[in-house]
Amino acid sequence: VLKNVQLQTPMQVFAKDGLLINQFGEKRRIPVTIDQIPEPLLHAFLATEDNRFYDHIGIDPIGIVRSALVLISTGEKKQGASTITMQLARNFFLTREKAYIRKVKEIFIAIHIENLLSKDEIFELYLNKIELGNRAFGIGAAAQVYYGKELKELTLAQMAMIAGLPKAPSALNPIRNPERAKARRNVVLGRMLEEKYISRAQYDEATNQPITAYFHGAEIDLYAPYISEMVRAEMVSRYGIDKAYNSGFKVYTSVESDVQKA
């Protein structure tokens, strides 16, 4: 299943010359390959979510022992016992069962995923699948939704902000809760510093950056609502609303953008 996974991606409608007229879908997603992701962004997720990702087999015994010790000594459940692979297993395959049953299944599925995919394939799939708030799924969409940028254009502070979202995409949302998001961003930067992914100077500069996130809608190049509605209705008629909206269809019309603008 994971070797040929089809992520839910919105349908896009284009003019003849490739200008975007509209898009339809429940989720905003811009799939990216791992070689398109800036190294500091990869490091931000590793430092925050699973700093031993490239060393373990899908589960991290060291992380599990640490979490158990914290639970025994303080009574608090420590975040971080779930590896990136376990989170991927949860996102794809698991339902809302009792926590201990789900965790056991998570472990076995994670080990299976590690035998099926390479580490880079797992990491890439995770970064494209993960929910990051404001209907943004995957880091490509998050960069666009919060900053109106491509991944390569993000600052270190912005990358850390995005990497802090998986823990609680709504509660830590920089648009709705900027102060909580800033605190979480600085935690991410602190972990990057601890793991020696960034220098003290980079940490100081990034933690002093203001919150710059605000909502960016889809970048529509050509306003033609009548055309896009005709396409939408036809695609829904042919494929049904779920497949039409979530299969990543790119529909090119015969509309000439210069004529439409005139």
Annotate each predicted stretch with a short phrase:
Residues 19-29, 64-67, 102, 241-242:
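N-terminal periplasmic "start-of-domain" segments of outer-membrane beta-barrel proteins
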Residues 4-5, 24-25, 57-62, 81-82, ...:
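Short, glycine-/polar-rich solvent-exposed loops and beta-turns at beta-strand/coil boundaries
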Residues 25-34, 48, 107:
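N-terminal post-signal-peptidase region of extra-cytosolic proteins
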Residues 33-84, 138-142, 147:
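Flexible, acidic/glycine-enriched loop-and-adjacent beta/alpha segments
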Residues 76-262:
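Non-catalytic, structured segments within soluble enzyme domains
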